[in-house]
């Protein structure tokens, strides 16, 4: 029976091919019976002997796993860029999107353009959950989220910037007491 006649029979509502056996279902039933017989003879260990779950030799049929683009087991790639203008910054963002680490040497750029470039690439790095680190004077490292950046000398070289107003140390009694109210103490 051809495919078209089978489709007509199903659509027309003929009791599924007028009682004809489906060849495919018969083979499935036969395979199920064979598996039951194997399990009854040797138990669950017989089925484990047929296939090794740790065998990585071949692909599993019907596997739904696909690789991530840009991820490889090869060595990580680092791009060193010495841009002369801001127009070259999209190349740095593209490299980060391809999961490559970027080192920007901005000594060839004007200071205002270099600041703009760092802000642009830092924004792109933030968008992909990456990391940024200042390596030296006008040299910056930008890494994607798959790369871990550690700085062994971070404790010695950088400290958080604390902004505070200067307090006159000559009069310690005033700094210890509460400030006078804005409406004036003389009115009370």
From Swiss-Prot:
Keyword annotations of the record: Cell cycle, Cell division, Cytoplasm, Septation
Gene Ontology CC terms: cytoplasm
Subcellular location(s) of the protein: Cytoplasm
Region (Disordered): 29-53
InterPro entries associated with the record: Cell_div_SepF (IPR023052), Cell_div_SepF/SepF-rel (IPR007561), SepF-like_sf (IPR038594)
GO biological process: division septum assembly; FtsZ-dependent cytokinesis
UniProt entry tagged with the keyword Metal-binding: no
Principal subcellular localization: cytoplasm
The organism's place on the tree of life at top rank: Bacteria
Subunit structure as annotated in this protein's UniProt entry: Homodimer. Interacts with FtsZ.
Function description: Cell division protein that is part of the divisome complex and is recruited early to the Z-ring. Probably stimulates Z-ring formation, perhaps through the cross-linking of FtsZ protofilaments. Its function overlaps with FtsA.
Family to which this protein belongs: Belongs to the SepF family.
Name this polypeptide is given: Cell division protein SepF
Gene: sepF
